[in-house]
Regions:
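RecA-like P-loop NTPase motor core of helicase/translocase proteins
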Residues: 1-186
């Protein structure tokens, strides 16, 4: 199954978001130093989809993620996504929805699939914000490496070294994205 045909306002939002992200990507590529790359990301590399319940924000986010990861345009990024849901009970639901709706996105398992070999643009790790940012035993496990998996921090560093951008979709941000300080640290 592929994504349903978007409604006019959804299509317009997706096109506008892609324009913003592609502009940020062009600025990032032209930047000559880390400070310029950080500025390009901070000023142009994020957006907020705010719309009423039932308007298809999750569908639009998936369409943006899928299209921006596609290798069919030079202005797209080679990107790995982290898709945050507000509650653990929604993780499996989000994974199933992404798998069934977006053929250009590949869901990966954050617990056991933290390796860079075989990574491709459009890979998506679905989890909760608390699972990577909170200070608890489960988070420490994800943030620690093992014999067969990298720590989350090392995974992100290696992906960046391999030329991947790191993208984040925060679904229902008002529910679980509590502390900006932890978000910046991540």
């Amino acid at each position: 199954m592929s994504a349903p045909a978007p409604k006019g306002y959804q299509r317009e939002a997706v096109v506008n978001a892609l324009e913003i992200f592609r502009y940020a990507e062009s600025q990032f590529r032209q930047a000559g130093d880390d400070a310029s790359r950080a500025a390009a990301t901070a000023f142009n590399g994020c957006l907020l989809l705010e719309a009423p319940t039932g308007s298809g924000k999750t569908l639009m986010a998936g369409m943006i993620a899928e299209t921006f990861a596609a290798p069919d345009r030079d202005s797209n990024a080679q990107i790995v996504w982290f898709w945050f849901t507000p509650f653990a009970t929604l993780v499996e639901q989000a994974k199933a929805s992404i798998k069934s709706t977006f053929v250009g996105l590949r869901v990966r398992d954050l617990q056991g699939d933290r390796k860079t070999r075989g990574t491709k643009s459009g890979d998506v790790y679905v989890t909760t914000w608390a699972s990577v940012a909170a200070s608890n035993a489960a988070t420490r496990k994800v943030r620690s490496g093992g014999e067969y998996v990298l720590s989350l921090d090392d995974l992100i560093a290696e992906l960046r070294a391999d030329g991947f951008r790191i993208g984040a979709v925060v679904d229902e941000a008002h529910h679980g994205f509590a502390t900006a300080k932890e978000a910046v640290r991540f």
